[in-house]
């Protein structure tokens, strides 16, 4: 059984530093607190989002990785779930989360502190520009959850060149995802799962695991 609770109201109702707190309790996954501010991004369906994060967490925890990037990270849902699972296994984990929204980064940092995660950094930057410029340490896994437009040709080709063993790609727009897959020529699709994130609409969330050829 998975549960999530969220309270929403007009942003004008809240004091500047007020935050909304989501507590998602899940069987077989750690308890991950996620904080949302009015201008931060979070999945529109918290119940399905908890299943989405738990699925990726299960995929990642068996991979031989220690260093990961979470690009377009929002409030850090994907990266925090994965880092917590890996750290609980005794692995030395380094997580870098990148998101353009400063409010979302504040929330992600707060969650990391609550979880007492070490070697976790969240920064308010353009995800594509960060990836193209940061060559100091190459991760073993990159997670991308881009806007509907996708990651685009430049970032996809950069990921090809970066020689990363694993990619997690989550998208609410299968058409842009397919276009990006055409650019990701060094990777092959290994796992895929759909989530009914938007009931009673034609939209859905797709998460995939890609492995370097």
UniProtKB/Swiss-Prot annotation:
Residue numbers annotated as active site? 172 (nucleophile)
Q: Select a single GO molecular function from the record's annotations and give it.
A: rRNA (uridine-C5-)-methyltransferase activity
> What does this protein do, in the record's words?
Catalyzes the formation of 5-methyl-uridine at position 747 (m5U747) in 23S rRNA.
Query: Could you say which enzyme class this protein belongs to?
Result: transferase
Q: Which EC number(s) does the record attach to this protein?
A: 2.1.1.189
Output this protein's name: Putative 23S rRNA (uracil(747)-C(5))-methyltransferase RlmC
The reaction(s) annotated as catalysed by this protein in its Swiss-Prot or TrEMBL entry are:
uridine(747) in 23S rRNA + S-adenosyl-L-methionine = 5-methyluridine(747) in 23S rRNA + S-adenosyl-L-homocysteine + H(+)
- InterPro entries per record: MeTrfase_TrmA_AS, MeTrfase_TrmA_CS, SAM-dependent_MTases_sf, U5_MeTrfase_fam
Q: Which domain of life is it from?
A: Bacteria
Instruction: Cite the Pfam families for this sequence.
Output: tRNA_U5-meth_tr (PF05958)
GO terms (BP aspect): rRNA base methylation
Species for this entry:
Haemophilus ducreyi (strain 35000HP / ATCC 700724)
Protein family: Belongs to the class I-like SAM-binding methyltransferase superfamily. RNA M5U methyltransferase family. RlmC subfamily.
Q: Which UniProt keywords apply?
A: Methyltransferase, rRNA processing, S-adenosyl-L-methionine, Transferase
Q: Where, in this chain's numbering, is S-adenosyl-L-methionine bound?
A: 43, 72, 99, 145
